Amino acid sequence: MARAGNSLISHGRVAENRRARHDYSIEETIEAGLILVGTEVKSLRTGRANIADSYAGPKSGELYLYNAYIPDWTQAVKAFAHEPRQPRKLLVHRREARRLISAINKDGMTLVPLYLYFNDRGFAKVQLGLAKGRKAHDKRQAIKEREWNRDKARVLRDKG
């Protein structure tokens, strides 16, 4: 059991990729499970993870999450320690995996992790976005639209 000073995450977000919605235009979102070892789960429950530079890709017909950083759990024995940036297998249905792999290969799309979280049952999940990369002018256009919507909402709020 955790001590009073520790705050463990039983459900909710652990990590968020804030750059994903800025650098990519997200076409579709997918929820996938993760295969993790015990020390990875314990480390995630303490809220320590980084998915900013990570991506998902195919490997022998299955999907893996690459470059996600889950640090070592400090209380673990070194024999049970895991590699912080090892590829982690994603759990999706076979048909969905085939569809996503074909979208990556044919359409030049990317699978970007948006959130890493624990669901209500306590299972580690990752929300992936099937995305296309944005060019610099697309990013500027998206920023202009966001500011315009913010200004529009402010005017409507102040008048009402």
Swiss-Prot record:
GO biological process, one term: trans-translation
Signal peptide positions (record): none
One Pfam family, short name: SmpB
Record's subcellular location: Cytoplasm
Record's keyword terms, sorted: Cytoplasm, RNA-binding
A molecular-function term among this protein's GO annotations: RNA binding
Primary location group: cytoplasm
Gene3D superfamilies found in the cross-reference section: 2.40.280.10
Keyword RNA-binding: yes
Entry's family note: Belongs to the SmpB family.
Protein name, UniProt field: SsrA-binding protein
Organism for this UniProt entry: Rhodospirillum rubrum (strain ATCC 11170 / ATH 1.1.1 / DSM 467 / LMG 4362 / NCIMB 8255 / S1)
